[in-house]
Amino acid sequence: MLNEQTLTTLNALKLFGMAKSFTDKIAQPNSADLSHPEFFGLIVQDEKTYRDNLRLKRLLLNAKLPQPACLEDIDYKHPRGLNKQTILELSSQDWFAHHRTVLLTGPTGVGKSYLACALGNFAARLGYTVLYLRAPRLFETLLQAKADGSHLKTLNRLAKVQLLILDDLFLTPLDDPQRNDLLEIIEDRYRTNPTVITSQCPIKNWHSIIGDPTVADAILDRLLHHGYKIELKGESIRKTKK
């Protein structure tokens, strides 16, 4: 009877991890060997694990990553110029602490999006908020936001997310609203939150794609300063796997 009351109380307090742990442990024959502090400590730890897992699930759902990539699963055998030491550096929290940008360039199919998603997955596991957006969808969203009056709110949301991933940026020349929006996003995040950008276009061509020289200078100065520049090469991994 007391156990049922305890379980009801734990659920009423929304301590669902503790409730499940309590149920599981009292069903184990050796649970009687645990002291009260030991038993309580174990179910408290299980509650923390439950909440951590729930938060991770929510972070990954909100991140909208298109593929479940992991840094641990990166294939270094494929000849694409990927530096293992650089990935090891990105496997620490240092680049988050210093708000460093990661710029991934290379032809289609060499794993830019996979690596970007792996960084997003890594960030979520550390407890950071993440958002993945393809560049065309980003600019479409901002255009709609201007029409419905939520433009500033959308920019603020993009500024606050702790890791923003912009995939397939600079595929086509930017128009005036697009480059101004991009400048606002990069400026808001500079020295505040890290950003990951992927592009098929080499960095040396970004200036001309942005268009306006003054805006291009401002954007590239912030992107290139103190950032990781990873240029992938070689044939498409998708082709070699066929």
Predicted ranges, named:
Residues M1, Q5, L13, G17, ...:
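Charged, alpha-helix-enriched surfaces in structured cytosolic catalytic cores
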Residues M1-T8, T240-K242:
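Intrinsically disordered, low-complexity and often Lys/Arg-enriched segments
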Residues T8, D24-Q28, V102-T105, N205-W206:
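Short hinge/gating elements
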Residues N11, F16-Q67:
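Interdomain "pre-motor" coupling segment immediately N-terminal to P-loop NTPase/helicase cores
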Residues L15-M18, K48-T49, W95, L163, ...:
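Generic structural signal for secondary-structure transition and capping sites
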Residues Y50, R55-S91, A97:
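Clamp-loader machinery-focused feature within the broader ASCE/P-loop NTPase space
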Residues L82-K160:
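Conserved P-loop
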